């Protein structure tokens, strides 16, 4: 290989290497980060036990939401789904963007009535769902639901 060919080869190699770095740098610069979506837009004065909503990249995780008032399973389920909808929208998502849903029932006998309210709440393509009956839901709620959605 003569001097001219080597220079041409080395010049092309340097250009390819520079292009590779240029492509890799934006990927590193745009790495996802954890964002806590605080109620009211600012962190509380004291460190809370848990966060109500956290996003990572375009994934959004909502902690379990219950209903803490007297009522039947239908009223509790409707309230919880309304709260989920409000929280999703405040974080830039929506019910039809929910990917995964966990439902915790205080009593399995409420399964059918909960489903009557739940049906259609997430649009025509509902998320995957797991439903379990648990020994107790905090705050005497008959149902608690948490979701994972995308933004």
Regions found by a protein language model. Name each.
Residues 84:
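Residue-level signal for inorganic ion chemistry
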Residues 96-98, 129:
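Short secondary-structure junction motifs
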Residues 98-107:
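Acidic helix-start/capping segments at beta-turn-to-alpha-helix junctions
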